[in-house]
Amino acid sequence: MSQFSTEDEAELQTLLRKLLKSVKDRISGAPSVECAEEILLHLEETDKNFHNYEFVKYLREYVESSLGAVIEVETENFTKGEGHAVGSGQDTLVHAVTKNTRESTQYKQMMQTLKQTMMMVVESLINKFEEDQMKREEMDRKIQHQQSISQYADNCSDSDSSFNQSYAFIKHEQLQVIAEKLDPGRPREVRWEALQSLCHAPPSDVLSCESWTGLRRNLSTALTDPDPELSDKVLQFFAKTFSSSPLNVTKDIYASIGNTKTLEAHFLYHKLSFPSGTTSIDANRPDMARLLKQMRLMNDFQKEVTTFWIRHPEKYMEEIIENTLSLLALHSEQGMSSPGSEKSLEPIHLISLLDIKATWFKKWMHGYYSRTVVLRLLERKYKSLIVNALQQCIYYFDSCDALSEETLEMIHSLEHQQIGPAGRTLYTSKELEFVYFVHSLCVLGRLVMYTNGRKFFPIKVKKRRDPVTLTDLVVILINIMYQHPKPSCGETALADTMSPTNLVMEVLRTLCDRTECAVECLYQIPVIETLLAPLITLLTGKLPKLNSMESALTHTADTLARIATTERGLSLLLYDRNLVSAEGESISAAHLIVQFTQKLLAKELQVENSSSMSGAFIFVCRQMYNTCEGLQVLRPYSLHECIAQAWRTTSSMSERVPTPVPGAPPALASQELQSVVAWEEMLLDNLLNFAATPKGLLLLQQTGAINECVTYMFSRFTKKLQVSRCEKFGYGVMVTQVATTAPGIVALQSSGFVQTIVVELWSALECGREDVRVVHPKSTPMDPIDRSCLKSFLSLVNLLSSPHAVWELLGHRALPNKTEYNLREMATSVLDLMDRLIIINSDAKIHSLFNYEQSHTFGLRLLSVLCCNLDSFLLLESQYKLTDLLLQGQRDNVTEPPSGEGEFIIDGLSVERNHILVRICAVGGPSERKLPPRALQKGNDPYPWPMVSTYPLPKYYIFDVPKILRTKQESEIGAFLTSSKETERDASWMDDCRRQFCKIMATKSNTLTGYVLADLLEMVVLHLSSSSNDCFFPPAEYKVVDNSVKTRSLSSVEQLGVEISLRYGKFLKLLREDSEQDLCLLLKHCQEFLSQQRVKVTSELCGYPGHDWFASTVFLLMHGDVGRSLSLLLRFSRLLPSAFLWPPRLHSSVHLPIEIAQSAIHPIYSCTAHYVEMLLKAEVPLVFSAFRMSGFTPSQICVQWLGQCFWNYLDWPEICQYVTTCVIMGPDYQVYMCVSALRHLQQDILQHTQTQDLQVFLKEEPIQGFRVSNYLEYMEGLERSYRSMVLSDMRSILPRSS
């Protein structure tokens, strides 16, 4: 079958025609001939029925009959020469056979024959196609030309291309004839036939012909022809052309449709007046129908053109924009006439009717490319459009009361409008005014979003003496929201998108979300006054003039909440005292809002107290009290108690909701229960947000609702819900904040939160994802902690950061140490993780892990972070003997040669164990110890650092520190002390001491070490404790009797703390070898003294977890002199700094209010850490933001630094200067010290936030390069700004009666 007979050619022609008919829908939608060809060329890839077409089957049979023998011969030859083709060799066989076949003579002959035959078939088809086309045109002349308006309404602005009519080609000569026939002087029938032919032609051919210019001119003339059929036909052609033409052509078509002079003449010729009174405009009236069609086609193009005009020269876009603005600016003077006078219907009214929400303008303003041109033209030529829009909003505002009864009905009718016979056809004047108002509001709302748009203001309008400013506009919009009527029952959903209230709120929300907009438009006193005016009225016992009280107040609260979300807005609400309260005092907005919220909760206002409205105002308060500065302002109102009381009341109501009984309406009972439960959850949610700050968490704990709040948070956390609509992050920060305290971690444990985190970790670590496809197996992890486990790792670090958390989750809990572990047995608690991943002391535990090395490395990394907190390490070491376990692991990781000593096997586990052993054994700051890195080096010696398998540590890891001696350099401060006799130390002595201290710190800070610092501290404490004005705590009698305390025993945790303290003291050459008994005696005295000042608390949370690091610091400072140390501590206990520098001092102390003493939340957390976060946000905002993004909190790391007196984070001289600075300068310097340290670490913090290991960095790394003396001046600046607030709050820790 190498040659085709005549019958074969006829059959081919028939099959090809069938194929083209089958794919007609595909190629008819192509915008050009080239695209149609591409569709046919790739038909096999896109058409699943390709191989079922008869034409394709025919060609396949032809190829098989022509080349079948050749392929068989080539296949046989190849297999004989190469052997059997299996596996990947199959591809080689196919490739070789195909190549040889295509090079054969038979293949070339077959292709030549096929090409010649197909060319004849296609030519015959084209000839037959042209004959059919001529016959069709002849038939078209005889058909009825009448087309209804509804047909156009359905089709005039669709995106169909010319291929919908037929797939044909038209010659340029034919288009020239059509252009001549469209001449206005020709008879109507001739022009009609020409339009018919034009509509059937491909638009691409029409637009590319030489006669297009004349053709377009004639089409524009036909568009204005009184005969509606001709103009409709032109619009149909334009509608099809828009979607398939380049912009340089479509902008000419757009200009033809929107010809300003033509349309203006049309409006004036037909005397289209604006309806008045009971009259209406009829969309079915011929002249009006034509205008609506024309405007609709323009509007469709306006909304679509933004997707492609950036690809063309700016001049095309500018022509389109100018044509539009020129058209909409028609009749501006008449349009601005007073409402009662006769005025004309304008293009802006029709575009408002067709595009009520000004979608075209929003799209044009979205991109900078077009927005620049729009704003430039509006400013230079068409500012009247903006003036008219503003005037329309003012007119609507002035007539709101008169329209209030009809507004809802209009909204309901316009919400689902459809112009044409199938929909609405009559529109009253009020409806046109309303849609013009909505359109104007949307235009103005979009305009003020942008800087250059806001520059149009202030704007001078009629009937207003002063120009309208941006602030005036926002006030008008808020008042419109207030005056909108309340939707009746059942209409709320229908009237939602079109109601003025929601439109105004949409604008206000947009402004709130953009900082610059909010600053210029919303953060203004008149705006805040307008928002709060109804609240002030209600607080004075009167009713405000609001058409819908609940709706207006709820929207007001929503706006205020969004304002409070930003720093500038929050500051405006908290500190600008420009409002007058009900009592006539000048107060800030925050005070007014919280007073109103309290009265709402107490139901003391003349308003229908719905839960949604109350919840909205609580949410405004929440946006303030979930920040440190906001809580500072709102705390005096005890809002947490008001919300907690409302929650308790609601909770009891939900318990009393009756069970549905037979015969009772079940829907009502169910709805009531849902409402009560929703209100209860809303109150819990708002209570929970007190936990966003340290002091707020203390307030939450005092309400007694912390367990319920954490359980609620856990339910939202498992659903991956955000904290609120105004929060960008999830619950990470709040969980971390809660986990810092003992009651918080207990609540997290009981809620199931801890178990969820552990299970997620175990699933990621041991289970992993399923390798569904062999071609894409799970990658081998290159990092010790795989990225899939990193989130769980950081969650655990945050959770276990505090020693309280470790104590509550692991204290007095023995490891299971099972003899056998089921492979399917998952870890569900922190104790399980300790047992399965960290303390792996048996083969059973090793065999129970699928990824032993990776999982154990993960466990050791977690252990390393936990051990950074000295108190956590002491607990773990005392219970689980970590050091012995790690040393044994190192000894087991040694080769066993036939003779001599073995060598350490360097692997990930041995390197990690080595790092931990050095970390837990060597104590010191950045210049006092050296920690081995975890990474290996390139070269012959990948790990040159000594491996630790026995104690003591190799000297490589410990720097040599010179012994501190009394020197002449200390004479300056020493001279000051010796010159100050006890009788001369009057009230001014302390001021002199501070000045001398600051002077020496600034010039010779290196001399403030050793004995002179001990002398200075001792004399300062003696002076302050001798003054009744400086004593903060009442005197406590304590008789120092060594024999009575020697019978006391130290716990294993305390004993280990003694060992570490002695090791550090000996390393610093401050202690003798026999100092252990003295330090133990000092600690026992401290315990005895403090135990006499503790309340008896039934809670299990009140045991102090850890060692007394401050007492050990004083012992080292006094060079091991137990007498001087105890004497200083006893005197120091009467001073305010002792409450914050000496953590055990106020643990469960009788000096604290009983509810705080029982909370187990120390003032170091609720006061010091709280103000660290507050000052950090104001002074070092980048660092504060970094903490927020990481899910870690500044309070956590500060509590760890302060709890262990900066041991392992600062060198010994800096620790001594920290203590002395806080005693001499004041306890508030503890806050400034932490802020300074975090400011010093700013670059590192920002870097590690990006690498997602901020918490690990802060806990594991010392504070490199930090010197107290370098930051003392900065701290003095903080003192001048914040002392009055910080120090007064520190003093307020005692009950007021004290």
UniProtKB/Swiss-Prot annotation:
Residue ranges of domain Rab-GAP TBC in the record: 1171-1283
Cellular location(s): Cytoplasm; Cell projection, Cilium
Phenotype of the disrupted gene, per the record: Fish are viable during embryogenesis and early larval stages, but exhibit curvature of the body axis and hydrocephalus, and curled cilia in distal kidney tubules.
Keywords linked to the UniProt accession: Cell projection, Cilium, Cytoplasm, Developmental protein
Pfam families: BROMI, BROMI_C, BROMI_N
Major localization listed first in the record, in broad terms: cytoplasm
Gene Ontology BP, a term: axoneme assembly
GO CC annotations on file: cilium; cytoplasm
Record InterPro entries: BROMI_C, BROMI_M, BROMI_N, PHAF1/BROMI, Rab-GAP_TBC_sf
Primary role: Required for high-level Shh responses in the developing neural tube. Together with cdk20, controls the structure of the primary cilium by coordinating assembly of the ciliary membrane and axoneme, allowing gli2 to be properly activated in response to SHH signaling.
Subunit structure as annotated in this protein's UniProt entry: Interacts with cdk20, which promotes cdk20 stability and function.
Descriptive protein name: Protein broad-minded
Organism: Danio rerio (Zebrafish)
Gene name tied to this protein: tbc1d32
